[in-house]
Amino acid sequence: MTLLGRIISFYSTCILSLCVATVLWFGWRPSFVQPVILAVILYLVPPLTFRLHRAFFPIKKSLSNLSERKYSPWWGAHQIQLIYTAVPQLEATLRIVPGLYSAWLRLWGSRIGRAVYWTPNVEITDRHALDIGARVVCGHKCKFLGHAIKPRGRQTALYTRTITIGSDVFIGAGSRIGPGAVIADGAFLPVLTDVHINQVVGSTSCSEPPVTF
């Protein structure tokens, strides 16, 4: 791991430390300022940090080797988002207010259409790698996996690609959508559907993935 990779691995620790400091400040001298600062630290600082990071270190939407002795932009992006994986309730809270979670994902760089319904336990690994149309329903415990990692001998292969979902799509509970997956307008995915890497799902049919990872 490079020096930059080691440094950025402490990003979530820094965010947590800022949150603790803000809470202690509130206990010492309470006012409306601290809750506002806490919300900014938790929900605005990470996506804005990600955008700045991406400006200098663009994430390649393709196959790469994590074992190489050079900085991985994906690794940095992963560390910036790590706090939401460790504490999923932070994201779930945003889904209480209609439209707020979609707006937050747009802040990360995803394209999200109107009237997308997110159930509280949806899991997204790469918040910048979604292209979703309008009126999409995401069922309970759906997973959107914008990357895949697989060992290949002495190498660690990383594949990243945007997930594309059309409009008027229903995604059944427990479904898992892999990187590069394309789901057509009007598609219906039954409960526990797995859409594999680069797989294309039509409104009535499902094709095998064109690329094997």
Regions found by a protein language model. Name each.
Residues 60-66, 109, 113, 139, ...:
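Glycine-centered flexibility motif
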Residues 97-129, 133-134:
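Short linear elements at protein peripheries
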Residues 138-213:
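Glycine-rich hexapeptide-repeat left-handed beta-helix
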Residues 52, 119-121, 172:
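Generic structural signal for bulky hydrophobic/aromatic residues embedded
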Residues 17-21, 116-118, 171:
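Hydrophobic, membrane-inserted alpha-helices
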Residues 85-87, 117-118, 150-151:
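A short, structure-level motif marking secondary-structure boundaries and short turns
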Residues 1-108:
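Terminal amphipathic alpha-helical/low-complexity segments used for targeting or macromolecular assembly
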